[in-house]
Amino acid sequence: MIGRMVGLEPSSRSGVLEECRECRAIVMKGDGVQTPLHKGDSILGGEGACLMRYAAWTLISAVDVVYCSLETRESVSLTFNPDGQVIVVPFMFKGYNIAALPTTKFGDLKKDTKQIENVVSFLRSDICYAVWEFLVSSVQYKDDDRFERLFDERMRGYLRNISEGTSKVYMRGNKTFSELLEMVCGRMLECSGRVAGGGGIVRYGRDVMRMLDDMIENPPAGMSEEEKKVYLEDWRSAKEWGGFLYSIERWERIAEVEKIVCNACKEICLGLREEELLGLLAEGGMKKTLKEEFSEDKAKDARYLEYIVVDDVLLLDAHREYGGEVTKELVRQMLLGKEGKDIDKRYVDRVAGVVRERQRKREEETERSVKELVGDEEKAKSKEEKAKSKRGRKGKSASAPSEQEEEKKESEVEEAEQGGEVEALPVEVGGARSKGGKKKSKGGRKCFKIHRRVLRWTKSPEKIKEEWDKGSEERWKGRSLEEIKEQKIVHDITGVLELLRSEDADRFFMDAGKYRKGGSERQRMVAIGALETGGQRMTGVVEVGTFKDGDGCPVVYHLRFKPTSIGSIGDVINPGVVEASDVGRVDEGEECEDADKFVYPKGVRFETVKETGSFQIVWKNPSDTSEVLRRLIVYCRPCVI
């Protein structure tokens, strides 16, 4: 009776409304999909929102371009959820990948010449409809199209004008995608006293309520008393839930929350380094799955907005009580996967405490840096005074050597203080000694074996090429020596196993899911990283693929650093995409080496460096250890409160 329809492709309507045999709810049926629209469900988020939601990112939309109008060919299953208000977030996806960030300007979108026509069409014609479906949705009735005709008459042109007006402003190039979404929501939900009749959305709400009153007062003829009773109960319930449609207070509150969330998302993206933004999107993406009803072909072409579900009153109160930093952290936690139903006043206070502590540490760090700067200036001044005094003396004094020794000691102390900020664990392999502090207990360390196809990359390029050419994997046969040298840079990272086996591994690696291929069940883990080599720095992910041997021990058969842009992080972490590109069959019978016993070939030198938020593997020139050949940095996962 009342519910949300979500379009997939613009076409004639094929979905019909029927009554559910079990609960007498009205059910939309279309192409084999049933959408229960239960009595009392509202067309909005809030008290009784019809939502399809996931922990972090929530899909609800269309193939190719989002058409959240009433012209639909298929329907998508929606889940009744009373936990909060739908708030659209300024991220646009295409398939599994980011198409627009909150900071994206139209000039950035124009770089994708293949997709720009679809993007422009969406912005000019449909973005307002998409937001409408998230925030308001549509009223349906199984016996006639009176509500559709009302929407066409009152709202279709109104929303189209908003889309055209806001898209023109955005396409001038100065606004970000976050500011575009804020404009759309602000104009669509405009209902202040400055607008005649309270604004388009309020006028539409009043018309809907008048139509509901008419249906209650004039039930269809020929009904039995029992049928009439059920009919009146349903429509009175619908009227009760639909009353918010003309609530000026509600729409003003939602518009304010949308503005706060859009601004928070923009600030989050502006304040993050590239690898941190990759981590945020990857962590949220792990908890996002395209709806099962979509085929793989549809999933990869879908263009859609996404939203979070949250108690809008609570979020607004938190913003007023604690300010923008706490609101920004709350939004960040929801992007990382925190569910709106788990966010209450106690959680808000907890987040506020974390933000205060973070600010305190930042202030202490700033104060310490200032003191160090002042100290350095004083030391420099003292050295200069000593030098002047020395030049003023006649001849060489007997104390000169001792002054030089004193300066040398001061320099050594400074270096030791600076070096104390990180824990360095240099390891020389191939029979040489191992340096470092105390050996850690093996408690909590994980067991791994290394497959021969991973160990192969530790050899010389010539030997690698020879073995691949003789092997069974077609993808590697016939590669040139230059290609092998390039691939060795991203595959020869076996030092990562030191981190993978440690008890801290879960702080760095995300579980990217399991799947079966080539007759074995495989598991995949990813971590955000950066590779520095040849004067270049590449951000991306460290991929680890494993299967279990006969004893149940994980065997690492795939290990690689994959350069990854922000726009393609979705494909990198999506199990379906990974499965399709994974090696067809792995020879599980090959002899594997215990990771604890693995050593690099003689002459290779690397060291691992643990810092607060990262783990580094540094490869050095064996002939000159001051020369760094490569550096792989693996970053900690974002903090989830």
Swiss-Prot record:
Compositionally skewed regions (Basic residues) per UniProt: 435-444
Entry-linked Pfam families: DUF1609, DUF3654
Compositionally biased tracts (Basic and acidic residues): 358-387
InterPro entries named in the record: DUF3654, UPF0329
Signal peptide (from-to): none
Region (Disordered) residue spans: 358-444
Full protein name: UPF0329 protein ECU11_0030
Source species of the chain: Encephalitozoon cuniculi (strain GB-M1) (Microsporidian parasite)
